[in-house]
Amino acid sequence: MEVLIFELILIAVLIPLNSVVKKHVPKWKGKAGEKLVKRMLSKLDPKSYYVLHNVTVYTEYGDTTQIDHIVIAETGVFVVETKNYEGWIYGSEKAARWTQGIFRKKSSFQNPFHQNYKHIKAIEWLIEQQLPCISMAAFHPKCSLKRVNVHSKEKHVLYYNDLQKCIESYTDVQLTNDEVQHIYHTILRANIMDKDIEKKHVKYLHNKFAKQ
């Protein structure tokens, strides 16, 4: 009898716990990926590259957008969307959604360049000018980029560990030092630190993509 009661209590505890874990795993994985990329970007020369992480800003439409990483330099503004995924990745530059395959199971996710398009537009609206932006979709090395067709010169899909090399490969000066400082400090001031706003943004994304 005591064993049965113990098992019932264990089930009562584990079922809601499993639900909580499933709900938060994507968020935890996303944060872990962002930390790895943060470490990679810290290798850039701080005298030449100004790096911002986990930036949330308002858009011209009054909603908010969360940007994983922004690197600002005289060679351009690098906007990085991180994906802490595993398995095989398939996608194309213009497709609305990309595919992740793990064994026989397939799932789709939003095209990271579509996400970055909104991020870039928000930054340009904030700065009030068009900027030399480079859009980057960075994936964890544990995944395999199987068939990903991206041909635009200023768009890159790559692994985390290739970020530094790719950013440093840009050598043509596009911005003055004063412009770099202005962009960096403007974004820094506009960054929303209110946790309630950030939670609302996460909830908005969850509801939006749950309907798709």
Swiss-Prot record:
Q: What range(s) does the NERD domain occupy?
A: 29-146
Pfam families cross-referenced by the UniProt entry: NERD (PF08378)
> Which controlled-vocabulary keywords does the entry list?
Plasmid
What name does UniProt use for this protein? Answer: Uncharacterized protein pXO1-01/BXA0003/GBAA_pXO1_0003
Q: Which organism is it from?
A: Bacillus anthracis
